[in-house]
Amino acid sequence: MKNIIRTPETHPLTWRLRDDKQPVWLDEYRSKNGYEGARKALTGLSPDEIVNQVKDAGLKGRGGAGFSTGLKWSLMPKDESMNIRYLLCNADEMEPGTYKDRLLMEQLPHLLVEGMLISAFALKAYRGYIFLRGEYIEAAVNLRRAIAEATEAGLLGKNIMGTGFDFELFVHTGAGRYICGEETALINSLEGRRANPRSKPPFPATSGAWGKPTCVNNVETLCNVPAILANGVEWYQNISKSKDAGTKLMGFSGRVKNPGLWELPFGTTAREILEDYAGGMRDGLKFKAWQPGGAGTDFLTEAHLDLPMEFESIGKAGSRLGTALAMAVDHEINMVSLVRNLEEFFARESCGWCTPCRDGLPWSVKILRALERGEGQPGDIETLEQLCRFLGPGKTFCAHAPGAVEPLQSAIKYFREEFEAGIKQPFSNTHLINGIQPNLLKERW
């Protein structure tokens, strides 16, 4: 396994991490160039210049979609009279197999605070909320302390750095619903409403939280902003090995020797992460399949391990980069059981707002349970494939159901024989008496 040496030039997100895994508080953070990006942004650049710099750097959303952050920011209204605007941080990290944002919030809370400060200035937002997964108790404590430290130091609140810019930041803990990872469901929950996605348009940029212009960004996305402002566009683009700029928190979980999370340049291959960082599979286990970016991404096979971890390459292979935290599957794991477990999670976490998702996902679970018991019926696999089509992109209110069926459709594609093994074999003619199944004879007679 590789010995990682983190430097500001190669690991802009994680170079400040302590070896003892304790949080980096304000004094230490500032001694390591902390809030330098914020100083440059607030005292030397206009909001539009910051938006253009982030756009030119090529920063893409790190929550899974990979949409241009600068372009998303530029969708906010230019009308100066719309002076009540919100910046929301999506920290509702509940995707199974995903744990990258937790590291940043627990150990580098000021990095997120600085990223939100710069972003709020660029968006002309006067208030921000970190919508945090309720189970992340340590992250909540550390973020609130970091906000208090920043406020006392004049880095949050009124007239920040003497610029006349005001920005307040709050932590809001969720109530344990996965669907709040969808930005409009998050907004509804923040407002105290039922956490279901909203119809678009209007988009949050024009009518979001409390009907005001709102921008929602992922934790890791916001944490990339300070380094871009501190070091420049060209530097940010050059630390990548791909046309996707910058670095990414990537990892491997499953029954590997060293499961974990590492900051790596885009373009690093999945095989390199698995073998050089995660140490390969545990002794006695053979690699079988993997999901590139969390539970809601399509399975790929060993033949895909040499793909670079970047949005386009993984997309062309038939999956999504997602969160870039891959999950390894070994030869002892039955794909029907694994997919059934995933689909149970997605069915339970459906908000129930639209019929295809509300009824379709539990139906898939019912069929998978039967296949797992060896009691599947002829046509069950075809029904599952049909469900995948009916729950695909554009067929439901949000992206929950399309993501939920990605592991199902890909598991059938690559491991169909394991699903076929769960089909109950029909009686042959030798097992019939006058065309009647033996267990039905008593009912007939």
Curated annotation (Swiss-Prot):
InterPro entries: NADH-UbQ_OxRdtase_51kDa_CS, NADH-UbQ_OxRdtase_suF, Nuo51_FMN-bd, Nuo51_FMN-bd_sf, Nuop51_4Fe4S-bd, Nuop51_4Fe4S-bd_sf. GO terms for biological process: aerobic respiration; cellular respiration; respiratory electron transport chain. Coiled coil: none annotated. Its cofactor is FMN; [4Fe-4S] cluster. Its EC number is 7.1.1.-. One of its GO terms (molecular function) is quinone binding. Gene3D superfamilies: 3.10.20.600, 6.10.250.1450, NADH-ubiquinone oxidoreductase 51kDa subunit, NADH-ubiquinone oxidoreductase 51kDa subunit, iron-sulphur binding domain. It catalyses: a quinone + NADH + 5 H(+)(in) = a quinol + NAD(+) + 4 H(+)(out). NAD(+) binds at residues 61-70. [4Fe-4S] cluster binds at residues 351, 354, 357, 398. GO terms for cellular component: membrane; NADH dehydrogenase complex; plasma membrane; respiratory chain complex I. Keywords: 4Fe-4S, Flavoprotein, FMN, Iron, Iron-sulfur, Metal-binding, NAD, Quinone, Translocase, Ubiquinone. Belongs to the complex I 51 kDa subunit family. NCBIfam families: nuoF_fam (TIGR01959), PRK11278.1 (NF008436), PRK13596.1 (NF010120). Composed of 13 different subunits. Subunits NuoCD, E, F, and G constitute the peripheral sector of the complex. NDH-1 shuttles electrons from NADH, via FMN and iron-sulfur (Fe-S) centers, to quinones in the respiratory chain. The immediate electron acceptor for the enzyme in this species is believed to be ubiquinone. Couples the redox reaction to proton translocation (for every two electrons transferred, four hydrogen ions are translocated across the cytoplasmic membrane), and thus conserves the redox energy in a proton gradient. PANTHER family: NADH-QUINONE OXIDOREDUCTASE SUBUNIT F. This is NADH-quinone oxidoreductase subunit F. It comes from Escherichia coli (strain K12).
